[in-house]
Amino acid sequence: LASAVEWKRKLHGKVTVVSMGPPNFITTIREAVEMGADRGILVSDRKFAGADTLATSYVLAEVISAVHEQDPIDLVFFGKQAIDGDTAQVGPGVAVRMNLPIVTYAVKIRAVDLDDRIVVIERKTERWTEVIEVPIPALLTCEKEIADIPFAPLPDLINALRYEPEMWTMEGPVEFDTEQIGVRGSPTIVYKMGTPALPEAGEVVNAREIGIEEALNFTLDKAEKAGILDVILGGA
């Protein structure tokens, strides 16, 4: 979002923020307006609940396509991945559905040429940084270093307090295919989420204090009780 706002100011454009979630996400939309977004749309309906990345990308692609019909889009910005599912699939899924060129793991926008309809992007890989030129409109999934989050100026703060985000539902303005939304449109279901159990602290034995033989016997006893010796010796 910070990168989108930065380039909006350079090119005298507009930024529209789209989010899919429960009604209380209205607060998040207002925060986006505080940062400089011009328009905010919350896509919210109980029928969208339980959506996996496939169903989510369908809904967002339909909404972004509708926005594009109202006011042509040059760049679509996504984060690299969500902090819950951590899949990094929704951005690429939207790009495929909208038939947009995509650059993932973007760390810098070098140039945007609206006359020649191209954008030049730096993207980070595990081994190096690539510089890629793609035609506009294009979709980017962005690393956090693509831009610094700016301090919101006072006029934007006041505007955000007064702003009423748009709420798009199953009732409109987009007509969604009920077979592709929510649980029905999701081939994957998360049954459980949790944090991994922390391993117990190990026991420390000082061989100098109890002697090598005692320390070795202690270690072998622990290994036998844990079944490690059976694995090493093949059950012998």
Positions of the model-derived regions?
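N-terminal glycine-rich FAD/FM-binding segment characteristic of electron-transfer flavoproteins
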Residues: L1-A236
